[in-house]
């Protein structure tokens, strides 16, 4: 069995949206890197990251932070605003192992 924890990023913080509504977001954690470390310490080997700013804008916005997460011991799969091969390549260039392209 494989359990993959997920982090939704907005303005550099981990948030939870209520039913996908950006107007109803709640900060879950200030430091995404610390939370990723907690997941790794709990035994996770993968991390799913969603760039909510990117999803809203139509192009990834949290590339630098996602790259920092990819430099941890976790394998990172990321998405949010990925619309073309340039976006995919930018994520691979910062160390992401898998890229999720959504509608």
Model regions and ranges:
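Conserved N-terminal beta1-alpha1 strand-loop-helix module at the mouth
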Residues: 1-74, 82-86
């Amino acid at each position: 069995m494989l359990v993959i924890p997920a982090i939704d990023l907005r303005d550099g913080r981990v948030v939870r949206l209520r039913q996908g509504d950006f107007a109803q977001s709640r900060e879950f954690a200030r430091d995404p890197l610390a939370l990723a470390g907690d997941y790794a310490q709990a035994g996770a080997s993968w991390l799913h990251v969603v760039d909510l700013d990117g999803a809203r804008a139509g192009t990834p916005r949290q590339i630098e932070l996602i790259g920092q997460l990819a430099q941890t011991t976790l394998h990172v799969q990321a998405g949010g605003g990925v619309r073309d091969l340039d976006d995919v390549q930018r994520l691979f260039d910062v160390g992401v192992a898998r890229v999720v392209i959504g509608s």
